[in-house]
């Protein structure tokens, strides 16, 4: 139980403190990569959804 509580606290703290990363800007030399960097956090969610599509394709065996 303590481990789960600790994990939840760590996750909440990382969410609260990582909000400063969203307002960070790339260096000027990498400014052309801004659209790609904006999409990158969504990629793990797409893999998660792909797992459900795959399981639906094989009838949730």
Swiss-Prot record:
UniProt-listed SUPFAM superfamilies: Photosystem II reaction center protein K, PsbK
Annotated propeptide span(s): 1-24
Plastid among keywords: yes
Protein keywords: Chloroplast, Membrane, Photosynthesis, Photosystem II, Plastid, Reaction center, Thylakoid, Transmembrane, Transmembrane helix
Membrane topology: Single-pass membrane protein
Subcellular compartments: Plastid, Chloroplast thylakoid membrane
GO biological process, one term: photosynthesis
Domain of life assignment: Eukaryota
InterPro entries: PSII_PsbK, PSII_PsbK_sf
Pfam families documented for this protein: PsbK (PF02533)
TM regions (residue ranges): 40-60
KW Disulfide bond (keyword) present: no
Cellular component, GO annotation: chloroplast thylakoid membrane; photosystem II reaction center
Oligomeric and partner information: PSII is composed of 1 copy each of membrane proteins PsbA, PsbB, PsbC, PsbD, PsbE, PsbF, PsbH, PsbI, PsbJ, PsbK, PsbL, PsbM, PsbT, PsbX, PsbY, PsbZ, Psb30/Ycf12, at least 3 peripheral proteins of the oxygen-evolving complex and a large number of cofactors. It forms dimeric complexes.
Biological role stated in the UniProt entry: One of the components of the core complex of photosystem II (PSII). PSII is a light-driven water:plastoquinone oxidoreductase that uses light energy to abstract electrons from H(2)O, generating O(2) and a proton gradient subsequently used for ATP formation. It consists of a core antenna complex that captures photons, and an electron transfer chain that converts photonic excitation into a charge separation.
Assigned protein family: Belongs to the PsbK family.
NCBIfam families: PRK02553.1
Name listed for the protein in its UniProt record: Photosystem II reaction center protein K
Organism from which the protein derives: Morus indica (Mulberry)
């Amino acid at each position: 139980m303590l481990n789960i509580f600790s994990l939840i606290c760590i996750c909440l703290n990382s969410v609260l403190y990582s909000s400063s990363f969203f307002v960070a800007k790339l260096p000027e030399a990498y400014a052309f990569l801004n659209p790609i960097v904006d999409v990158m956090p969504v990629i793990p969610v797409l893999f998660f959804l792909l797992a459900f599509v795959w399981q639906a394709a094989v009838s949730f065996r």
